[in-house]
């Protein structure tokens, strides 16, 4: 890496990618991020009666876990730097494709082999340190912002005289030749950080959930909590979640607030369940703001981390 490499880089204004989920529009950052996986999960899940199946039941959790495996498998195979790889975003987000993927789910049995094994190294990398914040003002502006230098202290290199630390996101490249995310010069890797937006009419929600590769699956759970189950943003963040850290296999982690009946139902389907704690940061940590059609603001902050929802006093 030379100074010229850094000097020639330019940030880009990008249009978000989106899908609709039961009448709500969900926006995510486009590739080279994992945002597309959250949208693919929701497209797959829309083929099932999630509300009727109940919140955090074995039936519902099984569908989410299986949808996660399918969406992440496609993401890992297809997503890289869009300037250097052709990424079939339209196909990946099509209803036809989601319906075909949904048909692959056995509602009574966990699928343990989905992702190509040569991409497993990404899932085995250590967790990252990420911050998320969201803000809204009286004029209707809303910001959803996430940032990370990846592993603790990033690369550990500080640019002299600046005080900022260079990241080490290059660790997320694959060394396998011919992949969208194969390491290469002047190339951005597939990465994890994704701020989110959710909208129906004049009701708008900014949200984000920190947690490495957990983020897309946590986004899908948050959106479902709001859309399928009618939770407010605080409940939607605090509700018990699952996380699947690996991209293959039947392992899954559940917070202990998930009912024992649901846990046993998953085990009976072949999931290798590990329970964590009631509020475990391994499933992600989030913040959210909702602006309703009347302009009233509601905010939520996840109890799994430090952080809070803070109203600012109006200026005199």
Task: Annotate each predicted stretch with a short phrase.
Residues 209-231:
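Alpha-helical support elements that line or immediately flank enzyme active sites
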